[in-house]
Regions:
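Short, intrinsically disordered, charge-biased short linear motifs at domain edges
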Residues: 4-7, 170-186
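Cysteine-cluster motifs in flexible loop/terminal segments that predominantly coordinate metals
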Residues: 20, 180-220
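Residues that form generic nucleotide/phosphate-binding pockets
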Residues: 17, 28, 163, 167-170, ...
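Residue-level signal for alpha-helical context at structural boundaries
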Residues: 32-35, 43, 144, 159, ...
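Alpha-helix initiation and N-capping motif
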Residues: 11, 22-23, 161, 168, ...
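Nucleic-acid nuclease catalytic cores
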Residues: 78, 84-178, 190, 194-196
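Metal-dependent nuclease catalytic cores that hydrolyze phosphodiester bonds in DNA/RNA
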Residues: 1-105, 205, 216-220
Length: 220
Protein backbone atom coordinates (compact mmCIF):
# COMPACT_ATOMS: atom_id res chain seq x y z
CA UNK A 1 0.00 0.00 0.00
CA UNK A 2 1.18 3.50 -0.86
CA UNK A 3 -0.04 6.29 1.44
CA UNK A 4 -0.77 9.82 0.33
CA UNK A 5 1.42 12.47 1.91
CA UNK A 6 -1.54 14.01 3.74
CA UNK A 7 -2.10 10.64 5.46
CA UNK A 8 1.46 10.33 6.80
CA UNK A 9 1.79 9.85 10.56
CA UNK A 10 4.70 11.11 12.65
CA UNK A 11 7.52 8.61 12.91
CA UNK A 12 8.16 9.68 16.51
CA UNK A 13 4.69 8.37 17.33
CA UNK A 14 6.07 4.82 17.30
CA UNK A 15 7.69 5.50 20.67
CA UNK A 16 4.46 6.90 22.13
CA UNK A 17 2.47 3.98 20.70
CA UNK A 18 4.78 1.35 22.18
CA UNK A 19 4.69 3.05 25.59
CA UNK A 20 0.89 3.38 25.58
CA UNK A 21 -1.66 3.29 22.75
CA UNK A 22 -3.84 5.72 24.64
CA UNK A 23 -0.99 8.20 25.11
CA UNK A 24 -0.28 8.05 21.37
CA UNK A 25 -3.92 8.72 20.52
CA UNK A 26 -4.20 11.62 22.98
CA UNK A 27 -1.16 13.26 21.39
CA UNK A 28 -1.62 12.42 17.72
CA UNK A 29 -5.41 12.16 17.36
CA UNK A 30 -6.74 14.49 20.07
CA UNK A 31 -3.74 16.86 19.79
CA UNK A 32 -3.15 17.03 23.55
CA UNK A 33 0.28 17.49 25.11
CA UNK A 34 1.80 18.30 28.49
CA UNK A 35 5.39 18.65 29.67
CA UNK A 36 7.05 16.93 32.58
CA UNK A 37 10.70 16.46 33.56
CA UNK A 38 11.19 13.51 31.23
CA UNK A 39 9.81 15.24 28.13
CA UNK A 40 11.72 18.46 28.85
CA UNK A 41 14.96 16.58 29.44
CA UNK A 42 14.37 14.60 26.26
CA UNK A 43 13.94 17.77 24.20
CA UNK A 44 17.20 19.16 25.59
CA UNK A 45 18.99 15.92 24.68
CA UNK A 46 17.76 16.19 21.08
CA UNK A 47 18.70 19.87 20.93
CA UNK A 48 22.29 18.99 21.87
CA UNK A 49 22.37 16.36 19.12
CA UNK A 50 21.37 18.99 16.56
CA UNK A 51 23.24 22.07 17.76
CA UNK A 52 26.52 21.46 15.91
CA UNK A 53 25.02 22.16 12.50
CA UNK A 54 23.41 20.12 9.78
CA UNK A 55 26.53 18.35 8.46
CA UNK A 56 30.11 17.54 9.38
CA UNK A 57 32.91 15.66 7.62
CA UNK A 58 35.59 13.69 9.49
CA UNK A 59 37.77 11.83 7.03
CA UNK A 60 35.75 8.91 5.68
CA UNK A 61 32.81 9.78 7.97
CA UNK A 62 30.03 12.17 6.93
CA UNK A 63 27.60 13.21 9.69
CA UNK A 64 24.18 14.66 8.88
CA UNK A 65 21.97 16.03 11.66
CA UNK A 66 18.20 16.68 11.76
CA UNK A 67 17.74 14.75 8.52
CA UNK A 68 14.10 14.67 7.30
CA UNK A 69 12.90 11.20 6.27
CA UNK A 70 9.68 9.62 5.02
CA UNK A 71 8.22 6.39 3.70
CA UNK A 72 5.20 6.25 1.39
CA UNK A 73 4.85 2.49 1.93
CA UNK A 74 4.74 2.89 5.72
CA UNK A 75 2.87 6.19 5.67
CA UNK A 76 5.21 8.07 8.01
CA UNK A 77 7.52 11.06 8.03
CA UNK A 78 9.90 12.42 10.62
CA UNK A 79 13.45 13.38 11.38
CA UNK A 80 16.60 11.47 12.23
CA UNK A 81 18.70 12.98 15.01
CA UNK A 82 21.92 11.88 13.34
CA UNK A 83 22.76 9.78 10.29
CA UNK A 84 26.38 8.79 9.88
CA UNK A 85 27.57 7.88 6.40
CA UNK A 86 30.80 5.91 6.34
CA UNK A 87 32.75 5.54 3.09
CA UNK A 88 32.74 1.91 1.97
CA UNK A 89 33.24 0.02 -1.32
CA UNK A 90 29.71 -1.45 -1.29
CA UNK A 91 27.80 1.68 -0.24
CA UNK A 92 25.57 4.10 -2.15
CA UNK A 93 26.33 7.29 -4.05
CA UNK A 94 25.50 10.62 -2.39
CA UNK A 95 24.93 13.84 -4.29
CA UNK A 96 27.94 16.16 -4.01
CA UNK A 97 30.15 13.50 -2.39
CA UNK A 98 32.84 11.33 -3.94
CA UNK A 99 32.84 7.61 -3.30
CA UNK A 100 30.21 5.27 -1.88
CA UNK A 101 28.64 5.54 1.57
CA UNK A 102 26.80 3.31 4.08
CA UNK A 103 24.09 5.00 6.24
CA UNK A 104 24.01 4.41 10.00
CA UNK A 105 21.18 6.15 11.92
CA UNK A 106 21.76 7.23 15.53
CA UNK A 107 18.88 8.27 17.79
CA UNK A 108 19.54 10.24 20.99
CA UNK A 109 17.56 9.41 24.14
CA UNK A 110 17.55 10.59 27.73
CA UNK A 111 18.05 8.16 30.60
CA UNK A 112 19.00 4.57 29.89
CA UNK A 113 17.68 1.67 27.84
CA UNK A 114 14.27 0.27 28.77
CA UNK A 115 13.00 -2.66 26.74
CA UNK A 116 9.41 -1.47 27.23
CA UNK A 117 10.15 1.84 25.53
CA UNK A 118 9.61 2.21 21.80
CA UNK A 119 13.16 3.35 21.07
CA UNK A 120 13.98 0.27 18.99
CA UNK A 121 10.84 0.68 16.89
CA UNK A 122 11.52 4.36 16.28
CA UNK A 123 15.12 3.77 15.23
CA UNK A 124 14.19 0.84 12.99
CA UNK A 125 11.43 2.96 11.43
CA UNK A 126 14.01 5.62 10.62
CA UNK A 127 16.21 3.00 8.94
CA UNK A 128 13.28 1.69 6.90
CA UNK A 129 12.51 5.23 5.73
CA UNK A 130 16.14 5.78 4.75
CA UNK A 131 16.20 2.48 2.88
CA UNK A 132 13.17 3.48 0.83
CA UNK A 133 14.52 6.96 0.11
CA UNK A 134 18.08 5.89 -0.75
CA UNK A 135 17.33 2.47 -2.32
CA UNK A 136 19.72 0.66 -0.01
CA UNK A 137 19.88 -1.81 2.86
CA UNK A 138 20.68 -0.64 6.39
CA UNK A 139 21.43 -3.59 8.68
CA UNK A 140 22.15 -1.69 11.89
CA UNK A 141 22.17 1.61 13.76
CA UNK A 142 22.55 2.81 17.35
CA UNK A 143 20.71 4.39 20.27
CA UNK A 144 22.69 6.90 22.34
CA UNK A 145 21.55 7.18 25.96
CA UNK A 146 22.35 10.27 28.00
CA UNK A 147 22.60 8.59 31.40
CA UNK A 148 25.35 6.04 30.62
CA UNK A 149 26.67 8.34 27.84
CA UNK A 150 27.25 5.52 25.42
CA UNK A 151 25.75 3.90 22.36
CA UNK A 152 23.66 0.75 22.19
CA UNK A 153 24.14 -1.00 18.81
CA UNK A 154 20.87 -2.17 17.23
CA UNK A 155 20.44 -4.79 14.48
CA UNK A 156 17.42 -4.26 12.27
CA UNK A 157 16.20 -7.85 12.17
CA UNK A 158 13.17 -8.97 10.18
CA UNK A 159 11.35 -9.53 13.48
CA UNK A 160 11.94 -5.91 14.53
CA UNK A 161 10.94 -4.64 11.08
CA UNK A 162 7.68 -6.59 11.23
CA UNK A 163 6.92 -5.08 14.63
CA UNK A 164 7.31 -1.63 13.05
CA UNK A 165 4.95 -2.56 10.21
CA UNK A 166 2.36 -4.03 12.58
CA UNK A 167 2.45 -1.01 14.88
CA UNK A 168 2.07 1.45 12.00
CA UNK A 169 -0.82 -0.51 10.51
CA UNK A 170 -2.66 -0.33 13.83
CA UNK A 171 -1.79 3.36 14.23
CA UNK A 172 -3.17 4.17 10.78
CA UNK A 173 -6.37 2.27 11.54
CA UNK A 174 -6.91 4.08 14.87
CA UNK A 175 -6.14 7.42 13.24
CA UNK A 176 -8.56 6.72 10.39
CA UNK A 177 -11.31 5.91 12.90
CA UNK A 178 -10.38 8.83 15.16
CA UNK A 179 -10.50 6.39 18.07
CA UNK A 180 -8.69 6.84 21.40
CA UNK A 181 -8.42 3.39 23.01
CA UNK A 182 -8.90 2.66 26.67
CA UNK A 183 -6.11 0.79 28.43
CA UNK A 184 -5.46 -0.82 31.79
CA UNK A 185 -3.75 1.51 34.21
CA UNK A 186 -0.32 0.59 35.54
CA UNK A 187 2.59 2.07 37.48
CA UNK A 188 3.97 3.48 34.23
CA UNK A 189 0.99 5.87 34.15
CA UNK A 190 2.63 7.82 36.95
CA UNK A 191 5.58 8.67 34.67
CA UNK A 192 3.35 9.86 31.83
CA UNK A 193 3.20 13.60 31.11
CA UNK A 194 -0.49 13.22 30.18
CA UNK A 195 -1.68 11.54 33.38
CA UNK A 196 -3.65 14.60 34.52
CA UNK A 197 -5.46 14.68 31.17
CA UNK A 198 -5.83 10.95 30.71
CA UNK A 199 -6.66 9.38 34.08
CA UNK A 200 -9.74 11.46 34.99
CA UNK A 201 -11.35 10.45 31.69
CA UNK A 202 -10.18 6.87 31.90
CA UNK A 203 -11.03 6.06 35.51
CA UNK A 204 -13.44 8.65 36.81
CA UNK A 205 -12.20 11.54 38.90
CA UNK A 206 -13.01 9.95 42.25
CA UNK A 207 -10.56 7.09 41.76
CA UNK A 208 -7.64 9.05 40.29
CA UNK A 209 -6.20 10.30 43.58
CA UNK A 210 -6.31 6.80 45.06
CA UNK A 211 -4.64 5.29 42.01
CA UNK A 212 -1.80 7.80 42.02
CA UNK A 213 -1.29 7.33 45.76
CA UNK A 214 -1.09 3.54 45.29
CA UNK A 215 1.33 3.92 42.38
CA UNK A 216 3.62 6.19 44.37
CA UNK A 217 3.50 3.87 47.36
CA UNK A 218 4.57 0.95 45.19
CA UNK A 219 7.45 2.82 43.58
CA UNK A 220 11.03 2.10 44.77
Amino acid sequence: MIYREEDFLLLSGLQHFKFCRRQWALIHIEQQWAENFRTTDGRLMHRKAHEKGSSERRGDLLILRSLPVFSASLGVSGECDVVEFRQTPDGIALSGQDGLWQPYPVEYKRGKYNERAGDLLQLCGQAMCLEEMLCCTIPKGALYYGEPRRRLPVSFTEELRQKVRNALEEMHELYRRGYTPKVRTSKSCNACSLKELCLPKLMGRSSVAKYLADALEGSP
